[in-house]
Amino acid sequence: MMILHLGAHLLFIGLIVCKANAGSSLRFTGSDEQWVAFPMWNACCESEMSFSVKTTHLNGLLVYFDDEGFCDFLELHVHVGKLRLCFSIFCAESTCVLSDVAINDNRWHSVSIMRNFRNTTLIVDDEVKWEEVKSKRRDMTVFSHLFLGGIPSELRSVSLQLTSKTVKDHTSFTGWIMDVKVNDSEPAIISSAGVHEDLCGSENTCLNGGVCSVVEDKPTCDCSQTGYQGKDCSEGLAHLMMLDRGMEEYVATFRGSEYFCYDLSLNPIQSSSDEITLSFRTLQRNGLMLHTGKIADYVNLALKNGAVSLVINLGSGAFEALVEPVNGKFNDNEWHDVKVLRNLRQHSGVGYAMVTISVDGILTTTGYTQEEYTMLGSDDFLYVGGSPSTADLPGSPVSNNFMGCLREVVYKNNDAELELSRLAYQGDPKLQIHGVVAFKCESVATLDAITFETPESFLTLPKWNAKKSGSISFDFRTTEPNGLLLFSCGRAKQHNKEAKSPVTLKVDFFAIEMLDGLLYLLLDMGSGTTKTLALNKKVNDGEWYHVDFQRDGKSGTISINSVRTPYLCPGDSELLDLDDPLYLGGVPESSSGTVFPTGAWSALLNYGYVGCVRDLFIDGRSVDVRRAAELQRAAGVKPSCGKEPSGKCVSEPCLNRGVCREGWSRYICDCTGTGFLGHSCERDATILSFDGSKFLKVQFSAAMHTEAEDVSLRFRSLRAYGVLMASTSTHTTDTLRLELEAGRVRLTVNLDCNRINCTTSKGPESLFAGQNLNDDEWHTVRVIRRGKSLKLSVDDLPTVDGEIPGDHTQLEFHNIETGIITGKRQLPTMPSNFIGHLQSLMFNGKPYIDLCKNGDIDYCQTNAPIGFKSIIADPVTFKSCSSYVTLPSLQAYYYMYLFFQFKTTSADGLILYNSGDGNDFIAVELVKGYLHYISDLGNGAHLIKGNSIKPLNDNHWHNVMISRDPNNLHTVRIDTKTTSQTTLGAKNLDLKGDLFVGGVPEQMYKDLPKLVHAKEGFQGCLASVDLNGRLPDLMTEALVCIGQIERGCEGPSSSCEEDSCANQGVCLQQWENFTCDCSMTTYAGPLCADPGSTYVFGRQGGVITYSWPPHDRPSTRVDRLALGFITLMEDATLVRVDSSAGLGDYLKLHIVKGNVVAVFNVGTYDINIEENGKLVNDGNYHIVRLTRSGGNATLQVDDLPVIERFPPGHIDSHRLGTGRLPYRRLVEESLPKNGRQLTIFNSQMTIRIGGWQKQQVSGFQGQMSGFYYNGLKVFSMAADGDPNVRMEGSVRLVGELQSSSTPHGGATVYQSSVTEISSTTSNTITITYSTPADEQQTTDELLVASAECPSDDEDIDPCEPSSGTLCCFVPPAGPTGPAISSFPGPAEVFRESNGTTGMVVGIVAGAALCILILLYAMYKYRNRDEGSYHVDESRNYICNSNGAALKEKNTADDDSGSKSKKNKNKEYYV
């Protein structure tokens, strides 16, 4: 088909009067230095601005305002000739609206922007579009001026002052703007640049091609070349275009289903020319007005998107002429005249047709050539106002009939004239009228289709008053299988079936829903629910379906595409009481007071409808759903219906292994088995850890009743027993419960019939799925119930189906519980508590774990820790080999399941033993560090050795599972290694007597079976003991408790290992455990694995300042600084430390062109150190570690190699070339005079984090975490309200930035901790901190932080450690040459002395006394045996780069032994 889209020229009839205020407008030239500033428009809530615009350019910025660099903004710009509006509130993802109206036609267009909280509406001429931003806050914050045409250059050059990231990339607007109004008033111009007042730029200054010019400051029109006259060239020969009409006009009203049909087949018409004339009036954008002809020869006249469309085919191809008005649309409810002329000429056997169409003087004329000469005419039906199937007509650009008024429809040619409107009015038999047509012009509302884009979108319509009878019809179209189309219900009423029955709530309701592609009618008038399948065919194939529901009393019909299905409601009631509104497309999420009936499955399952709806009629009256959506600002509801091409899943939009399926113009991600949530499975689902005492309980304020449930969850456990999830009722035994039983998932559904009049079922229905699910791997469970039907699936295994017996299908519950069932009084059995991890608990579409965590529901209780925690349940320590407890005999006759966790350093020991009748027994023991399981079922003892690569007495926790099934398959699993063995013979284990745990009485060891090697009991820790699904308390349930047994797991259970401290934290071995130094990690917590204090620095800039008290300002030779941050800024100051006024010492860490740069000056010149290997303004989390020792410094970003800086000629450079820095002399006077200013950072006064200062814009913007500087955790101090910390500008504290399990690339911000001890020497207070090792350097030397070491500066030998508690520092390996540890040992701090003379005397006296005591102590220690005070190397560890601990090496040289012994008595160690 060939289509020609033709332009139009304007022919005005009559006199057009210009506007009184059309004298001037603002002309924008498009220069970069162009803008107009109006006062701030307070567009936070409900407000409106409007203007008129004219342009010929494709792009340009029209409107802009924001909150000056923080979150909120609104921008309107011309984008490829159309208007595009984008806005954001509270840092939410920006939302954009794109108009379909082309405005670059050099014509005036009216534009309005309407703000309504989260909604913003863009109106261009008569087109209305709106969007809603997904923001937690609904008000928009505005600080800037209202800018039109562009923005000042000073704003473009400074990105921090512009909230929108793209506005500075837009070109300035070129064209005219006038009639600017804000809330119906004209704002005053504050300032402008590059904008001119254009007297000829206003609307309709000169019409019909007249040329405007300014004469004596007034616009003047030159009409000499137009054929018109008058002040504005509007006076033409209107009388020549007037039609002679009779005294009577024939008008008919069409409402969408009516049409005229004139049969031309009996008397075809042909001629060389013909003419079609008619007048129309409508509000509808689309609709067929007239059609005649078949596939190869037809004429089609219709309204298409508010313009008049003429499509003609004369046999050799089709073309389309589209006539549009200058402003607005033709569907403006005004009369418009249409004339179509066709003239045929023949030349050399070739026909030449001239087609002319005129609409209110807008003319389009086209020549059209045919291959063969044929006459014009038709022998087919001639349709007026519509047809039986408009979408199937050849060449029809629209699919629906006309709705509005048609007047004087006439077809005439050289031989005949058909006055079709008159023939219809007079009832001519040749013309058939379909439908009821009113022969007068009546108002007809437009019935545009709307699209529900999300399951959460819906419309609220007026209450449907249909007590005795009523009807509803509509069309719908979708490809999605589930959705609630219509729903309304009445008020809840008390209902008693029997005197003994409880009072329940009943509601009348009406619903039309789609489940699994089938359409159902649901109706309840108080006597019971009827559920009718409308059509035994799926209707989600993307085609339009017409639904017609008719009701008369308790009976009626529902039809789809004229296929009718009758229904009959049970009971005697014939009145339908609906008190709530009628909801279209879904129901509100928070329907307080609305009781959803149990039969409305889609409402209870939160299945909203996604697709299109049109032509809604209620009781024979049309409902303008498009207008209703506009008035309600309905989120997710858009006008029109367009199906986007399939293939949304081709780009794999579902993240993290989410399963994608096609929806209606959208993709749908099934995140059930992924551990993620969100539209695209992009958000981590919350994990809860359960140790047998933890639970989560969701409590509902009223009893919930359902007949359909969708339940899914993920779990991970080492135990074979434990309740995963259960719905429980306060009054009944109703439950839907998921639990682990013998390594399988068991689904139990019990519907209590005892308290209601129903057919009693045989009891709970149970289904089982999966096996060996206690493997400490994630498993996904799904449950689908629809009435009596049950489906249970685990992972990707086949689904297990079941059916509930009886006629009762209603489940009642008050709670949803996990981990522990608290209301056990209503349950016949006591399910075992759960030990493991749960996430992604979904019940009828609601993720309850995440709702509880985020505080989105207020009826949730939980004590389960959030996150994936290591689970050690109820640990007990057997402190000696002779300790044990006894429990009742193990019941393992047919099968057995045992689980426990243990940790020990002992290679041998009896863990479990239970004897029985005859030779029956079981025993579990450690033999040389390996686990043995011995059992005898009467046919002889069998030994199974556990599969482990190395001995298990490694002081780590190990998980042990031992099982025996009815077929005598014995399985032993240790951690992840499994061993299985099948025994023959007897299958029953008959145990008697007590079960011994941890050992047996001493006299019993010699009588144990031969295969049992144990000669003593187990020494160590046991936890999570599970005996066939029972979790005994070894302390309180023990029959006998012998020896030293304590709760918890103490002793040498915590020693430094490679992974003891996370995130490069430094492990410090203690006597019975270890601690982690997190100072330089930006993380916190006992293992450096917890989130720390995080601050957000906003776009306006902010700063956190720590100020030392004036009397306590430190001077340092060594500084250590660490922080983590996320930013997109290319240049910003992170932190600056300044000395007191006049000294000039400072240290600064900042970002320059995306690289981290450190600069400091301690008295001589600026020293720089820079990391150029990685850009840090990429929005990811980065950690920066900076150390300074005198003029030397190291810098490390993330895990990159450490960068070292040694200034040439520095005094310490020479010292580093021959040995280590003697970080011992802390008294400032002892430092060399020529190096004092180069090494000492004097009198530190302030720490400024964020870099922002008033009237400056170089501050940091983003998030910063875990700040640490010389023992100061400023962020934690700020959060605790420390009086020395002050915050200014846009700074706010946030909580957790990310998951603690994420590595640096994933960017989690953590806090740091430090241990400190202080001592006083002379007038200088010295604080020495425990220090971690740098990640890059290694050496065999030890650097011990000491408060005092009596050696001069040339002495570079280290002080030897004493026998006190030791924090060891190992300078890691670095490049050859001058070497300094990247993170020096102590942060040496000098405090200024402000004491009086009396204080000095006191200090001197005290010092003298200390010296005497010290000399005496040295004498005593000198004569002691050296082994009595040396460090116990077995309990002191050296921390390496990844947190591992290495045993201390002796670093003292042979020739320095005496000196070291002399000095070590005067050292203090951390």
UniProtKB/Swiss-Prot annotation:
Entry GO CC: membrane
Signal peptide: 1-22
Location within or outside the cell: Membrane
Occurrences of domain EGF-like (ranges): 196-234, 645-682, 1052-1089
Superkingdom as given in the UniProt entry: Eukaryota
Cystine pairings recorded for this chain: C200-C212, C206-C221, C223-C233, C405-C441, C612-C641, C649-C660, C654-C669, C671-C681, C1021-C1049, C1056-C1067, C1061-C1076, C1078-C1088
GO annotation terms (biological process): cell adhesion
Compositional bias (Basic and acidic residues): 1448-1458
Function: Neuronal cell surface protein that may be involved in cell recognition and cell adhesion.
Family stated for the protein in its record: Belongs to the neurexin family.
UniProt-recorded name of the protein: Neurexin-1b
Organism, as annotated: Danio rerio
